[in-house]
A protein has these predicted regions:
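N-terminal leader/targeting and assembly helices and adjacent pre-domain segments
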Residues: 1-163, 285-382
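Alpha-helical structural elements
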Residues: 11, 105, 130, 148, ...
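Short, exposed beta-strand "edge-strand" segments with a Pro/Gly-rich flavor and a Y/T-containing core
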Residues: 64-67, 173-179, 231
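Contiguous, non-catalytic segments that form substrate-binding/exosite surfaces or channel walls
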Residues: 122-208, 213
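Acidic, glycine-rich two-metal-ion catalytic cores of nucleic acid-processing enzymes
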Residues: 179-287
Length: 382
């Protein structure tokens, strides 16, 4: 997926991050307010009323963010389709023949279908977000701490504050599985863009009589897909890849079956239509070999050897953990828990040092934009 599409998705995701921060702030503020009460002054009805008002406000903001983002989804997916039409693999063939109006209509209809399905999924995700469940659990903990006369209120509510900040707004699936809303939305939008890129390219290729597929390629590939990325496969052999069977590329190299299909299970590769008559491979053998060699050479971090792919995965994990700790720090700030805020800052500082080390040793460009959290204010560690 291109940089422009990634930027568009990141811009859209800021809306949901803002709602998530608002959710954290509201819960934390109410926890702090409850802590100022005592067993005789606590009023459960008033607390539940305030909670209900806040939940309605959060839900409305989430609905607005979702509705606004639906327009973005259609724009993002149209851009993904436009990239297919300008793909260099089709340039020469399109000089010889044009795409029929019927084929264009099918491709457009498919793109619209994916757009509508993704829009429905985003709406469903927002509607199944457990705002009230996690909010109520945190408030119940706070009320119990005050009602029982605990002397150390902050210690009693600290775990609840941590959970609110670390988990954020959660989607609850029918299976009972929980996942952060922002993570679920981002993955669904990316999956849809990749579906359009791959399947519209295949539809174009079928219309033009293309006989093969070229797999996309990138540096720091996962080990199971690295040997085959950037290679060209007949349609029959690509089907073997997807169905877990042995396969060959068009040069005759035989490969063992792989478990993870292309474009699935968090795979960022896609298959693009390729003509052995018209198309020119996007990636040379020399480039693919260099990427593989650089990946294997890897780097040593804290006495352990990592491939560059593994180092990249480690950086993504650290980025996620720093964001989570910043969310907890925001919750601690609004709950007035300075000790928790200090603890978060120490973890953030330690993670940031490790992140810088991994980036320096691996040569991977740091992505500090992935670690920003609205409302986070660093504090000086005591």
């Amino acid at each position: 997926m291109g940089d422009n599409l990634n930027k568009a998705i990141n811009y859209m995701m800021k809306r949901f991050e803002e709602v998530n921060t608002f959710f954290i702030e509201k819960v934390a503020e109410q926890i702090m307010a409850i802590g100022e009460l005592n067993p005789t002054s606590i009023n459960r009805i008033a607390i539940m009323t305030e909670m209900g008002t806040n939940i309605n406000d959060i839900t409305q903001r989430l609905a607005i963010a979702t509705n606004t983002s639906l327009r973005d989804v259609f724009k993002i997916y149209q851009a993904a389709l436009d990239d297919v039409y300008t793909d260099q693999r089709f340039t020469q063939a399109l000089k010889q023949q044009s795409i029929s109006s019927e084929a264009k209509a099918r491709i457009t209809q498919y793109t619209q279908s994916v757009s509508i399905q993704t829009a429905k999924t985003l709406t469903n995700l927002s509607n199944t977000t457990a705002v009230s469940e996690s909010y109520r659990t945190a408030i119940d903990t706070a009320v119990m701490a005050v009602s029982s006369g605990m002397t150390d209120y902050q210690s009693a509510t600290r775990d609840a504050i941590k959970q609110i900040g670390y988990n954020g707004m959660q989607v609850v699936y029918e299976s009972g599985y929980h996942r952060r809303l922002d993570t679920a939305i981002r993955q669904n939008v990316i999956d849809g863009a990749n579906q359009i890129a791959q399947n519209c390219s295949i539809m174009m290729g079928d219309e033009l009589g293309y006989d093969a597929y070229e797999l996309s390629a990138h540096a720091r590939s996962a080990p199971d897909h690295e040997p085959i990325q950037g290679r060209v496969f007949s349609k029959a052999d690509f089907n073997n890849i997807q169905n877990g069977l042995p396969f060959r590329d068009i040069d005759g190299t035989l490969y063992r079956a792989i478990r993870r299909p292309i474009g699935e299970w968090n795979c960022m590769h896609i298959a693009m239509s390729f003509s052995t008559q018209y198309s020119k491979r996007r990636y040379t053998d020399a480039q693919l070999k260099q990427w593989a060699a650089d990946n294997a050479k890897g780097c040593d971090i804290e006495g352990k050897h990592y491939s560059i792919y593994e180092a990249g995965q480690l950086m993504r994990e650290i980025e996620t953990e720093i964001r989570r700790q910043k969310d907890v720090a925001v919750a601690a700030q609004y709950a007035g828990d300075d000790a928790l805020r200090q603890s978060c800052q120490k973890k953030i500082n330690s993670l940031a040092r490790k992140y810088n080390t991994v980036a320096q040793e691996s040569g991977i460009t740091p992505r500090r934009d992935r670690m920003t959290v609205q409302g986070f204010k660093p504090v000086k560690v005591k």
